[in-house]
Structure formats: structure tokens, C-alpha cells
């Protein structure tokens, strides 16, 4: 089902491919950036946190972290990894559209194309919830490659990639009337094939800024990379930094 595709997406070969992309080196580089954004020792909310790779690395560096994800498997994996590493953090199964906290966090992050999982009404539930969860002056970082200015210039009908022993083919269809990118992914390894459908709702930078501003989150900067290069048409990703007024 389109609205909840992500609940069952990260399984099997698909999950192995995601792990191959999310290397320890990438995680360290991303957390280097996040460490420069948030005050030392800040209480942070990572939503959705996936398998907790950023949540755990931030905790290792002294942040008080909480990770929330809709996947029970991811949360179980994250909690086990934290226990094994002796890292103190909190993980909860939950929906990013139904955050329960009020003025408890110094910062929050929505990393990795998650801002776009939903159509406008549900996306606004997340915005309202994360704004409520932040203290006044708290910061939000949104990152992903699906802002309109980033993804639309780069959409191809079909692409094939090889990652280690996995062949990954994507077939894209842009639904202009809905501003939605529909993608069929075919994942193949050792003769075994998995097919997944996924959808991302595409918002322009101006739309994202307005969505955040409607709940008191003022955009203070945008980047296209973790070395803070400016965001522009054709950039591979958007990193947006906002602050609660």
C-alpha cells in the first residue's frame, strides 16, 4: 500500500543493499556534521532512526539520544547494538506522524529521504509533532535527496547499479499531478530476485520552508553537502537547518 510502503520495504536483499550503502565511514562523516550543528551533550530525537546507526554514533559522542522508528525489527537491532556497545540511548517503536513529546529535546533530525514519505496532511503531522517536541531554540536538521530541486533534474526512467554482489535496478515514473515519484526496485543476488515498490512525495525547498514555518520552525540555512556547500538546482541532496522560535 502506497501510504505505508516503508513498513515492509527494509527486508531481505533490500535491507542488505541499504546496509552496504550506509557504511561506518558515511555514518561517521554524517555525525561529524551533526556534531557541528547541535550543542555538546544536547538531548536529540532521531526520527525515523532506522537501525539506529546515527542515534548510536551520536550517543557515543556524548549526546543524549532517543530513536523512534515504525519497524520493530530495526528498533530491536538498534537496541541490541547499543547494549553490545555499552552505549546508553533510548529506542522506541513508533510512527513519526504521532510523536508524543512536548518541549523535551534540544534538537531533532529527520535523515535520509524520510521527509517525503507522506502526502501533505501526514507530512504536516510530523512537522507539528517535531516542533512540539523541541524546546524553544531547539534545532531540526532535515536531509535527503528528494527535494524537488535535487531529484527532478536527475530522474531517469531506468537505472541499474551493482553494489558488491547485489544488482539493483530502478524504474521511475513521475506522477506530475500528485508531485510523487513512483519507483519499482528490483534487487537480485545469487539468482534470487526481490521486487519492491516505493513512493516519495516531492516538495520544493520553498514548500518545505513554509511547512516548517507554519509550526514555528524558522529555516536558518540550507546546504548541499556536509562541508556546507550551498544548495541549488541540481544539487544531489538538501540539508536544511531550522530553529524553533
Predicted region positions:
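Conserved class I S-adenosyl-L-methionine
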Residues: 1-48
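Class I SAM-dependent methyltransferase SAM/SAH-binding core
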Residues: 53-98
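A short acidic, Gly/Pro-enriched loop at the edge of an enzyme's catalytic core
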Residues: 100-107
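Residues lining the SAM
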Residues: 111-113
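SAM-dependent methyltransferase
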Residues: 121, 141-211
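A short glycine-rich, Lys/Arg-flanked "PGG" loop and its adjoining helix->strand segment in the class I
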Residues: 124-136
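C-terminal lobe and adjacent flexible extensions of AdoMet/dcAdoMet transferase-like proteins
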Residues: 205-245
Amino acid at each position: 500500500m502506497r501510504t505505508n510502503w516503508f513498513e515492509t520495504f527494509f527486508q531481505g536483499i533490500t535491507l542488505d543493499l541499504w546496509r552496504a550503502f550506509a557504511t561506518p565511514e558515511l555514518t561517521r562523516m554524517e555525525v561529524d556534521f551533526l556534531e557541528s550543528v547541535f550543542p555538546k551533550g544536547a538531548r536529540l530525537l532521531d526520527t525515523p532512526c532506522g537501525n539506529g546507526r546515527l542515534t548510536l554514533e551520536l550517543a557515543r559522542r556524548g549526546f543524549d539520544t532517543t530513536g523512534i522508528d515504525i519497524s520493530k525489527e530495526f528498533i530491536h537491532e538498534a537496541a541490541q547494538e547499543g547494549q553490545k556497545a555499552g552505549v546508553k540511548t533510548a529506542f522506541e517503536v513508533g510512527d513519526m506522524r504521532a510523536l508524543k513529546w512536548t518541549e523535551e529535546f534540544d534538537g531533532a533530525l529527520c535523515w535520509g529521504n524520510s521527509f517525503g514519505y507522506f502526502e501533505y496532511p501526514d507530512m504536516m503531522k510530523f512537522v507539528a509533532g517535531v516542533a512540539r517536541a523541541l524546546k524553544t531554540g531547539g534545532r531540526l536538521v532535515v536531509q535527503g535527496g528528494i527535494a524537488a530541486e535535487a531529484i527532478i533534474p536527475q530522474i531517469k526512467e531506468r537505472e541499474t547499479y551493482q553494489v558488491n554482489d547485489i544488482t539493483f535496478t530502478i524504474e521511475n515514473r513521475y506522477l506530475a499531478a500528485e508531485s510523487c515519484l513512483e519507483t519499482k526496485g528490483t534487487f537480485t543476488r545469487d539468482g534470487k530476485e526481490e521486487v519492491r515498490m516505493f513512493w516519495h512525495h516531492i516538495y520544493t525547498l520553498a514548500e518545505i520552508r513554509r511547512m516548517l514555518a507554519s509550526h514555528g520552525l524558522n529555516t536558518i540555512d540550507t546546504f548541499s553537502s556536509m562541508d556546507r556547500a550551498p544548495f541549488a538546482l541540481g544539487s544531489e541532496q538538501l540539508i536544511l537547518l531550522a530553529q524553533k522560535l
